[in-house]
From Swiss-Prot:
The keyword Cytoplasm applies. GO terms for cellular component: cytoplasm. It comes from Polynucleobacter asymbioticus (strain DSM 18221 / CIP 109841 / QLW-P1DMWA-1) (Polynucleobacter necessarius subsp. asymbioticus). The gene is fabH. This is Beta-ketoacyl-[acyl-carrier-protein] synthase III. It catalyses: malonyl-[ACP] + acetyl-CoA + H(+) = 3-oxobutanoyl-[ACP] + CO2 + CoA. Its EC number is 2.3.1.180. InterPro entries: ACP_syn_III_C, ACP_syn_III_N, FabH, Thiolase-like. Keywords: Acyltransferase, Cytoplasm, Fatty acid biosynthesis, Fatty acid metabolism, Lipid biosynthesis, Lipid metabolism, Multifunctional enzyme, Transferase. The active site is at residues 122, 255, 285. It is found in: Cytoplasm. NCBIfam families: fabH (TIGR00747), PRK09352.1 (NF006829).
Length: 328
């Protein structure tokens, strides 16, 4: 008998500190950087974002989202076989121990539960979900916790108006479990390392020092142009694998990078924005957390219902992109 995977539960978490555009404008003005609510909103669709407290780590955000997802699925951490965490802002310099291992400990999961991180920036959750699905299909694991969590505020240059107004912190999680009926229908992952410089943190660490900038940089125009192109391509690819057409998709749950990218992708897919889950206005770009955050919000709002077909897609630094078609 074939083994499939399905989403059994979802959860999300946002840090307590919420900054509206005006809050951020006033904060930046104190450092001599000028911007405006209108400038931010018209270019990105963002009205607010959340920032982690100084003592909050990526694992703390991930833990809250994970606990909510476990509760939603009706299981406990002792039921888990594997934890996969997508992040570009791990707890530890160098990325080890993995933030997934930290979350495993904080959850109280047993040592039989494997744990590791994946890193594909804003496409990270699609990579993590596709990996979890593959593990379940092989019969290796039955219950996998998949998390996307970021504290991007830690790597923002608050003298760079083009990036510091766009990003926020948060976490989202799903419990993926083995099923006799298909839930995840198809996945597709891609990367183009030749485009690595258009969205990156250029600095490198060595001998106890950081060489180059420790903050993210972005060529916004290049990212926009490439993102819309590859998102359309991977969406068609993953739908073809699932034998679905765009009109059969009930909800598009995209990476919440920028309202213009989401509108551009929906238009190319021939989909109305009424069928797109949009949270970027309240969350900003939360990188690997954005898709599971949007998914959980769509479910909790009652928009997304069991039995509906969803298309998840994301694109990020690397350049990396991916998509997942599923029946919720």
């Amino acid at each position: 008998m074939s083994i499939f995977s399905r989403i059994a539960g979802t959860g999300s978490y946002l840090p307590e500190l919420r900054l509206t555009n005006q809050d951020l404008v006033e904060r930046l003005a104190k450092t001599g950087l000028e911007t405006s609510d209108e400038w931010i909103a018209t270019r990105s669709g963002i009205s607010a974002r959340h920032f982690a407290a100084e003592n909050e780590l990526t694992s703390d955000l991930a833990l809250k989202a994970a606990q909510a997802a476990l509760s939603s699925a009706g299981i406990t951490s002792s039921d888990l076989d594997l934890i996969i965490l997508a992040t570009s802002t791990p707890d530890h310099l160098g990325g080890f121990p993995s933030t997934a291992c930290v979350v495993q400990d904080k959850l109280g999961a047993h040592t039989a539960c494997a744990a590791f991180d994946v890193q594909a920036v804003c496409a990270g959750f699609t990579y993590a979900l596709a990996t979890a699905d593959a593990f379940i299909r092989t019969g290796s694991y039955k219950k996998v916790l998949v998390i996307g969590a970021e504290t991007f505020s830690r790597i923002l240059d608050f003298q760079d108006r083009g990036t510091c107004v766009l990003f926020g912190d948060g976490a989202g999680a799903v419990v993926l479990e083995a099923s006799s009926e298909p839930g995840i229908l198809s996945t597709a992952l891609h990367a183009d390392g030749s485009q690595r410089d258009i969205l990156c943190v250029p600095g490198r660490s060595g001998n106890g020092a950081v060489h180059g900038s420790p903050f993210m940089t972005m060529d916004g125009q290049a990212v926009f142009k490439l993102a819309v192109k590859v998102l359309e391509q991977v969406a068609h690819e993953v739908l073809a694998k699932a034998n679905l057409k765009p009109e059969q998709i009930d909800w598009l749950v995209p990476h919440q990078a920028n309202i213009r990218i989401m509108e551009g992708t929906a238009k190319k897919m021939g989909m109305s924005m009424d069928k797109v889950i949009v949270t970027v206005h309240e969350h900003g770009n939360t990188s690997a957390a954005s898709i599971p955050l949007a998914l959980d919000c769509g479910i909790r709002s009652g928009q997304i219902q069991r039995g509906q077909h969803l298309l998840l897609e994301g694109v990020g630094g690397g350049f990396a992109w991916g998509a997942v078609a599923l029946k919720y």
